[in-house]
Amino acid sequence: PGCSSLGVGAFSENGPFRPSGQVLVKNEYSWNKEANVIYLETPAGVGYSYSADAAYYQGVDDKMTAMDNMVFLQRWLQKFPQYKGRDLYIAGESYAGHYIPQLAEAMVEFNKKDRIFNLRGVALGNPVLEFATDFNARAEYFWSHGLISDATYRVFTSACNYSRYVTEYYGGSLSPLCARVMNQVTRETSRFVDKYDVTLDVCLSSVLSQSKILSPHEQVGQRIDVCVEDETVRYLNRRDVQAALHARLVGVDKWAVCSSVLEYELLNLQIPTISVVGSLVKSGIRVLVYSGDQDSVIPLTGSRTLVQNLARDMGLKTTTPYRVWFEGQQ
């Protein structure tokens, strides 16, 4: 939580342009080729977004974020009524495994009183859906990809697993045992592996700032130079760009990928949202859960386990068998 969909989603992943030096270049894989896309910097305090009351930034949580996001969409549709009634899909990645289901749930509930959201589906990429399952999948992922030793894998799954470490860390009660285990894991995985794509050169990563939120131990004393991210930061801090975007900085000196003023209730990580996904399916909302298979932060193995269990509990059947998926010749 606390990182920008403008900086990451729009400029590093699926937006219409990417920064290249002093200019923008077209992204041939832009989602804008298929739909009108809004990239929302949320909650207030992220990126260019701000609150008139700085006290807002203290203790922001999932519930507040869902309500604020829904109010934003309500007011956006009021301002641009030509978009009312159009099919609406909401998408996100990582901690948006909380943001998106919770927002969709609020929209479904609101529609019972006043149907203004034509919500058709949601898409969740490598999402945090259930804290222990998702976070503890990291150990097996590291081990299976040769990033940690057998001995480290054993202590990372028995002495102190990742969900326990994160709980202690954000709860301000980090035990010496978990500190030792994470030091060992960090030493072996190193800061030269992009945790969001373990096969990439770290310089090509676009999302390492987020990993400092979901991998808190690794933020101490480390600053990895990430090329795409750095170009985005430089571009969005240009005065002429800010003027063109009608954006201004309030309460911060510069635009950053992840907020330095927001104090999010990070233990909201422990709130499961997989059941919310199930309720959305029951209400007729289409749900896509997809995973990049080289992401070690929220590995596909955890997501697959959660989705399979949900499908079993709901009595859902497989309609399309598992298959090789080609895009062009790849």
Model-derived features: where do they sit?
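Terminal and linker regions of secretory-pathway proteins
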Residues: 1-330
